[in-house]
Each structure stands twice: as structure tokens, then as C-alpha cells.
Amino acid sequence: MSDFDETAKTLNFDAPNSYIGRSVTRPGARRLAQGRGQFVDDIVLPRMVHVAYVRSPHAHAKIVDIETKKAAAMPGVVRVVTGAEIALVVKPYVGVLTHLAGMRSPPQYPLAVDVARWQGEPVAAVVAQSRAEAEDAVEAVAVEYQELPAALDAERALDPGEPKIHKEFDSNLCFTRTVDTGGVDAAMKSAHLVVEDTIRFGRHTGVTMEARAILADYNRADESMTVYHCGQSPHMVQGIVASRLSLDEHRVRIVVRDVGGSFGIKIHTYGDEIAACALSLMLGRPVKFAADR
């Protein structure tokens, strides 16, 4: 008899508080079905502005020049900010996961500085009175790129001749992990049939009902920041915002109300979200960013 069978003997699956085999009622379902959810994009604060980002169309490119005058003169535009400007108020961070020991990442900023290293990386931010005005002005920002060789295949990216995406490192290796449960060779030899195959799949992500969103409100009077966020890790966000913007952690308040789905994508903190916080710090007013599809 297995350990599971022994354990199962001690469990009462018919206990009144057991969820096994029962339909579980969602306490908040009625409120959400009535349209009474409280999501980040529902929040409107006095003097609030919106940010949209100019993103690199290239997987790897040098940023030669960014012309912002035309965009800055468009209706509703409050400010256009480049990576070099935002780097003055944000400490660089490394994009690693602490539970993956040895993961490598060079210091980086919320907006690309000098070089864009992935397609879609923000290179400039446009802040305007409305989201529509910000998105319209994004189209007026002229960025001159010098396209660089890119590593486009995950398998070939480790070849010595492949372009190095981060000049700080000698290869494109992010991290390594070895999983060894023991007895693998013996199991393969004794198996009736061994099937080997290479399975390829395309890019995928979690597509949530509510896209990523953040509303940062910096109060210059008491040097505090309130961040309305739809993520799953408010304490982590508090620490990151405080450390990157040189704020006392107890002066950073994270408010998470309803989270419109995640599938894992809202566990992390993203550069465009930190950029929104930095812009609120720079402007002294609430700044909202809501991602689109």
C-alpha cells in the first residue's frame, strides 16, 4: 500500500468543509456580474494624466535619435520623455527571478537607453490629458534606429557566432537548471518503448479580461506615492517602487482591488509600470497606464 493510500484513510472527504467533489460558490461573483467591480482603469483621480509608449519595432537596434517636438506640440500632450531622461530618476534594476538561482540580467531602465533589445521595448513615453491623445502623439514621435543583428532562435542563440544581446555578458545564456530525480538511465533501458521528439510551439501569454494597468499618484507635499495596481504581489511592488525611485518604503502604498485575471502575467513588475511611477514622481500628478491588446 502506498503512502497516499495510508494518508487517504485518515481524510474525511465527506466533511462539511471539504471542497472535493463540490461546486464552490464565488463570494464576489454577484458583485462582478452586476458590473460593480473595482478595476484600475475605473479609477479617475483629480489632475490625472495618461501615458502611452513608443515601442521599438526591432528585435535589436541602436537608438540613433528621438525627435519629440512634433508630438510635444499636439493637443493635450503634457510631456514627452525619453529613456535618458527617465534614467535620471530611476535606479537601474535587474530582470531576475530570485527563486531561479544564477539567472543573469544586466542593469536596465524602464525605457531603453541607447539600444533596444527586444521588439516592443519602450523607448519613449508620451503623457497627455487623455489616453487617446497620448496614443495619437506616440505616432508623431520619430525614432531613428540602426538595426543590429538579432538572436531570433532560442536554440541557436547559444552558438558562439550568434549576436550577443547584452554586451555585458559573454553569451546569451540566461540561466541553467538541472533536474535529476535519479534512476533515469535505468528507466529508459527497461522501458518497453522510448519515444523521442522535438516539440516546437509559438509565442504565448496569458490573455486576461483586464489587461495590465497601473495608476501612480505621487504626493510632493509628504513625499509619498499611492499606486493602484492589478497585480498579485503588492508587497513586492511596494519594495521595487520604493527602491527604484529612492523613496522610503513606508511612504509607498499599494492598493489592489479586483484583479481581472492573471494566468501568471501579473505576478511580475514590468518596466512600463515603473516608468508610470517615475513619471508621476517627475510631474507631481497621477499617471495612469493601461495596456491594450
Which residues are covered by each model-predicted region?
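Helix-loop-helix junctions that connect adjacent transmembrane helices in secondary transporters/permeases
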Residues: 96, 162-245
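Short, Lys/Arg-enriched charge-dense amphipathic segments
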Residues: 102-115, 169-183, 273-282
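Alpha-helical support elements that line or immediately flank enzyme active sites
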Residues: 53-88, 124-145, 214-257, 262-283
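Residues that form or immediately flank small-molecule/cofactor binding pockets and catalytic motifs
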Residues: 38, 85, 199-200, 232, ...
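Flexible, low-hydrophobicity surface segments
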Residues: 1-171, 194-197, 289
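Cysteine-centered functional microenvironments
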Residues: 120, 255, 293
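Structured beta-strand/loop patches that form or line metal/cofactor-binding pockets in enzymes
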Residues: 287-293
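Solvent-exposed alpha-helices and their adjacent loops that cap or buttress functional pockets
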Residues: 25, 43-47, 108-110, 115-120, ...
